[in-house]
Curated annotation (Swiss-Prot):
It comes from Dechloromonas aromatica (strain RCB). Signal peptide: none annotated. It is an enzyme of class 2 (transferase). The lineage of its organism: Bacteria, Pseudomonadati, Pseudomonadota, Betaproteobacteria, Rhodocyclales. SUPFAM superfamilies: Aminomethyltransferase beta-barrel domain (SSF101790), Folate-binding domain (SSF103025). GO terms for molecular function: aminomethyltransferase activity; transaminase activity. One of its GO terms (biological process) is glycine decarboxylation via glycine cleavage system. Pfam families: GCV_T (PF01571), GCV_T_C (PF08669). NCBIfam families: gcvT (TIGR00528), PRK00389.1 (NF001567). The glycine cleavage system is composed of four proteins: P, T, L and H. This is Aminomethyltransferase. Belongs to the GcvT family.
Amino acid sequence: MLKKTVLNAAHRAMNARMVDFGGWDMPVNYGSQIEEHNAVRNNCGMFDVSHMCPVDVVGADCRTFLSRLVANDVAKLKVSGKALYAAMLNEAGGVIDDLIIYFLTDTRFRIVVNAGTAEKDLAWMQAKVAEWKLDVTITQRRDGANNLGIIAVQGPNARAKVWEVLPQTKAATAGLKAFFAAEVDQYFIASTGYTGEDGYEIMMPAGEAEALWNKLNAAGVAPCGLGARDTLRLEAGMNLYGQDMDETVSPLDAGLAWTVSLNTDRDFVGKAALVTNGQQKQFLGLILLDKGVLRGHQKVMTKQGDGEITSGSFSPTLQQSIALARLPLGVQIGDEVEVDIRGKALKAKVTKPVFARNGKAVI
């Protein structure tokens, strides 16, 4: 039996094509994935991300707990509403999950974890609270009486559309810089996203989600499915958990070194392994020079040895096939490499691992 978000009926009313996404009944598109992708790059689109799991972390030892739990340093969170992207690691330095941590007060944080990893993440967090004997209470907000719905509104016109539909939120959100959140009435509005565009991710009581979804649609915001979400995040060079990294992959090998704070005395789970092992691979982009489509798990042949594509697809913005790949150290941006596509060695160019943001190509 597939799990359903609070917006399931709304998707079906809009004739969405539904698919099994990690055990969730989710919309892959509402007609044209390309049109949905372009709507976000050029105007505004909205996504149901209610399958993601908000987790409230409350208690006197919140900071101590989070400083030991993740590789990024929560000491950076000094202003209420500030968010931090972080990786939660196992003892071997592999990525259990990537998540966003919101600082609200010194005794109240909110974490958003991935849909498919929510159960294992919660179990890991609870185990660490017990092991470290900390005054921390962890409450998931996806399933149950106090569950939240989440709608991501993304694109250059996203803010204007949100203010049109929720005018009472404008004063608190107009000045939000990237990776900040504000609470207005029952809405938790964050200037975050997974598309490379401006916009908000809005959490609200689950019972309010369908009304907001329909109001946004009536205001001209295009509903977008998982298909467009994937090509948008790929163009933006954003990792997908389970594809670009997992529990066997170090954040240093997944292009996430910028989220790892090693230069302090702070200890965290997985730190010793990262220090011992260092970086073994590098995370770069590819653009296919021959005809074909780059896909995950295709082998990449370089002068320094073999690598592997972790995510690949056709880019609607570049009109080329692009990929993210884990490649040997020593490979340089601009190098020409070969990709094994159905037994044929096709040429590709190595690029930085970001292709398009803010409505245009950056390659």
